[in-house]
Amino acid sequence: MTSRLALILLITAFVSTSVLAAEEQPDISGVWVAFSSNPGFVGAVSEPQTAQGKAMVEEYFAQFENHVEPGAWCVAPGMPYTMLTQVSYPIEILQTENRITMLMEYDMQVRRIFMDGRSEPADYPPTRVGYSTGQWEGNTLVVETGLLTEDLDNRWPRTEQTRIMERVYLSTFEKEEVESTGFVSTIADPVSNDVLVFEYSVTDPLLYTEPRNITMYYQRMTDDIFLEYDCPAGNWREALKAANP
């Protein structure tokens, strides 16, 4: 009887601790808009530092003399730049115990951060947003992203060896004391006092001699309505006009 009671108490304590830990996780769900960065907006462009990286980018652009901005062809930038833009495209965060999903109005991109302890799969194809796994360290969400496609015409160029580390945590305007560096922002009259801080560290032995770091600041919004980022429609209409002059 004593052993059974001890077992019940042990299970109860374990369950209570697990529930408490889950309850202590910060609620980062909702709609957020970037309003500032450190370094500032100019710092959102990252040039290769290694001789090999510079040569790779120069060779790429020499091959495509009539280079245009990829965004003009609705090519999504992917990570990390998709999270660094300050053109006031909102992101919506959906938070569950085993997964955090980030929906972006910008190019309608989707990030999935797996929180169930899994490892990066060996047979997963590289993508523009990569493969992200995360865990809570106290009140900080720590995310690692790999399996990224090579993209040399990006504001933050990357190769398949690029790794991105993120530390994400809730804060307030008073604690951060940052000014708006974005194009559009409601920081002058914020709808809430919540600030979501993203600290990024990007490494790539082919491109950089040291980690490239940038911190982004997002403010919580009350309006959860997204507009449709229907980028391909314009290109389709232009193609129809060209085919039927």
Where in the sequence are the language-model features?
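Hydrophobic small-molecule pocket/channel-lining residues, especially in calycin-type beta-barrels
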Residues: A21-P245
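Bacterial N-terminal signal peptides
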Residues: A6-T17
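Positively charged n-region of N-terminal signal peptides that target proteins for export
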Residues: M1-L5
